[in-house]
Amino acid sequence: VSDVRGTSVAAIADGVRAGKLRARDVTEAYLDRIARLDPALGCYLLVDAAGARGRADAVDAARAAGRDPGPLAGVPIGIKDIFVTRGLETTCASKILRGFVPPFESTVTQRLADAGAVALGKLNMDEFAMGSSNENSARGPVRNPWSLAHVPGGSSGGSAAAVAASLCAGATGTDTGGSIRQPAAFCGVSGIKPTYGRVSRYGVIAFASSLDHPGSFGRSVDDVAALLEVMAGHDPLDATSIPAPVGRYREACRAGREGRQEGRVAGQGLAGVRIGVPDEYFQPGMDAEVEAAVRAALDELGRAGAKLVPVSLPHTKYAIATYYLICTAEASSNLARYDGVRFGYRTKDAHSLEELYARTRGEGFGLEPKRRIMLGTYVLRAGYYEAYYGKALRARRKLADDFAAAFTQCDAIVTPTSPIPAFRFGERLGDPLQMYLADVLTVAPNLAGVPALAQSCGFTKGGLPVGLQIIGPPLGEEICFRVGAAYEARTEWHRRLPPDPAGLAAGAPEVAS
């Protein structure tokens, strides 16, 4: 295997399962790319080369022995450093968890391993998943493969950038307010935030428990679907896990591409599908090139047979305030467990228990987790709880009701993923409000718990990707994949590859075959 740039999950898995590829050769090709290119990008916090080789050899041995190597046989994946991995350091990109080696495995990573996937290492992220630019990592930022001067988005910036740069074929991520979809849009790849409870949170380090959604990244919608089929499903170890059968996500992609259902015309994979377009997601202040690309994508979906219908999500204007009240309140509770006593970083020479707590947390947490802990503690104070947190919970219900009403009129809702393309490093770091507003179009699906898929739908004149967001009803991942695959079947945006870091200054983007 000489060149794995742009190789799909299916191409690798099918090749390994058929004996045309060796998992070990594929793994070595990706490890070589990581060694050569990741110093310029910063996607990986830890590369588990020995472990990856061992896992690849096990896949090859299983096939040679006539055993099923799994649906993701030999597929090299990256793991966001928020998923605990037994025997492998897990830090959430924070100093306070430096040296923490979990004694157990997350459900998601275990399911991927059982399916034959080869984990290459742990991916960089915003500290404790708090951020929209990957500038908050205690280990340094991730750079966008399309322009090293621009952010990759966050918090799953390492995952999105690694997939875009072909440093893995797919990756895991988590999405609390847009942390899969926004970096997918900024890096020109695909990513899904499934329905809340569709994918187990067991072994996912908590930020805001009622908002955290594990999901997947891939170069295409098909890649994302293949990973999610393995990751999804009921888990008795997660009290919020939904006991519902896993959808046929890859079949939904095929239906969108081919329009094979009865009565459909070839190329009309969305015949009969109603797509809602909410005015609230196209407000003044949106980048003109972003809006133009998304409007063009909507037109393309219409040509694929979909009917575009106007819908209203009237409480969208309250989504950002509601989100940041709830997520900071939950974060202040979840992060109270990091005290220097049981695991992770511990300050030196503390003379009392109170000093141990205060100095450990002061030295171990970065600025953004401290900011959110303080905000959350404030809104949960006696006398303020009802005025802030209680009101936010009622607003959350209103937002969920908006989606429920909209889905009586349409099958899926399509919007921009972000009102802007990727911004430059440092451009918003000193202004928390502007940074938080980068999530304005992604937080509402988290508050409502509905699935949402992001994919590439164009590029700015400056060569930066633009993202499309497809939102489905609860447990409606299949309609998201069908719409996304129908769009990819009619366009080539998902095939464009960023040049390797050494050549970023010159040359047009390449197109994968």
Briefly describe each language-model feature range.
Residues F104-P236, N446-G467:
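Short glycine/serine-rich loop segments
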Residues V1-R53, D57, D299, R303-G305, ...:
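An N-terminal boundary/leader segment
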Residues A50-D60, G116-A117, D126:
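Long amphipathic alpha-helix in the N-terminal Rossmann-like dinucleotide-binding domain
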Residues G19, Y30, G74, D114, ...:
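Glycine-rich, small-residue loops and helix-cap segments
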Residues K193-A297, H315, A350-R359, A489-A512:
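A short helix-breaking turn/cap at a secondary-structure junction
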Residues I12-A18, G78, I96-V101, D212-R219, ...:
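Short, well-ordered beta-strand elements within core beta-sheets of diverse protein domains
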Residues L37-L41, T85-S94, F423-F425, E478:
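Cytochrome P450 core scaffold surrounding the K-helix E-X-X-R motif
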Residues P71-V108:
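Enzymes and membrane/adaptor proteins characterized by extended Gly/Ser/Thr/Asp/Glu-rich
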